[in-house]
Amino acid sequence: MSKRKAPQETLNGGITDMLVELANFEKNVSQAIHKYNAYRKAASVIAKYPHKIKSGAEAKKLPGVGTKIAEKIDEFLATGKLRKLEKIRQDDTSSSINFLTRVTGIGPSAARKLVDEGIKTLEDLRKNEDKLNHHQRIGLKYFEDFEKRIPREEMLQMQDIVLNEVKKLDPEYIATVCGSFRRGAESSGDMDVLLTHPNFTSESSKQPKLLHRVVEQLQKVRFITDTLSKGETKFMGVCQLPSENDENEYPHRRIDIRLIPKDQYYCGVLYFTGSDIFNKNMRAHALEKGFTINEYTIRPLGVTGVAGEPLPVDSEQDIFDYIQWRYREPKDRSE
């Protein structure tokens, strides 16, 4: 998944950008995931609010905006800034850790270790490539490209290449491009492809060739340019749309391809389509109805709370039907 969220271009873009910056600090520096989730949820809710927010009290009426976040909104609206963020930006260690985590492959712990060794900038990283693993070196190599959002038009062209090449190999393959793209987003951070085939189920033996054949085909047509990692069920790499001429090359983009057993495919499609908050709400509703859902299965809960056998699923609609929830099109899941 993409490391960066799109800058907000909504009525309340200043507020949502502030909350996203706070969220990233809590995740990357403080490693306080509960605060990260709280800021992200508030940012997501405010981004969809159809009016310009004039006070923290107004924001607090929205689900997911508590007293502390409302106070920060009041301060931001009154002064145009936030003291906490100013302090974070002025703290060399915090800002360096936050920056390094934007490099694909560098997580918060690795970033802190690098900063402790005095490595704080892209230039520092380039001088110390021997300290980086293969994944991180590729992240550094394409840093500027990976920072750019992928316009929907480009994603549609990328999708055409992937789906056409997959069907050429074997019409029985099923592939879906998930993430915010499937929810109709105007731009994406990366490309997340789910893949399945009738020959691969949760009961059968592993079928890594089903994934590797697709990767090799996409390399053959020069769509996949680099490999970050290639396992039995997941490929992580880099892709690039072919261009008409060398002068107007498309940026390199991150791509993940996951091979999922056919009987678990639609639970996977639902999960990887998101959004995170929509998934949490759906899981909570499922529990109320006596089911447990994850990225693999939906299972009924017995009276003791122990999950039973996975239920058969042949579409996303089946999952909604089991938990008696109105079906929501992917475009209506961006909570």
From Swiss-Prot:
Mg(2+) 2 binds at D190, D192, D256. Its cofactor is Mg(2+). It is found in: Nucleus; Cytoplasm. The keyword Nucleotide-binding does not apply. K(+) 1 binds at K60, L62, V65. It comes from the Eukaryota. Its EC number is 2.7.7.7, 4.2.99.-, 4.2.99.18. K(+) 2 binds at T101, V103, I106. GO terms for biological process: apoptotic process; base-excision repair; base-excision repair, gap-filling; DNA damage response; DNA replication; double-strand break repair via nonhomologous end joining; homeostasis of number of cells; immunoglobulin heavy chain V-D-J recombination. Na(+) 2 binds at T101, V103, I106. There is a cross-link at K41, K61, K81 (Glycyl lysine isopeptide (Lys-Gly) (interchain with G-Cter in ubiquitin)). GO terms for cellular component: cytoplasm; microtubule; nucleus; protein-containing complex; spindle microtubule. Na(+) 1 binds at K60, L62, V65. One of its GO terms (molecular function) is microtubule binding. This is DNA polymerase beta. It comes from Rattus norvegicus.
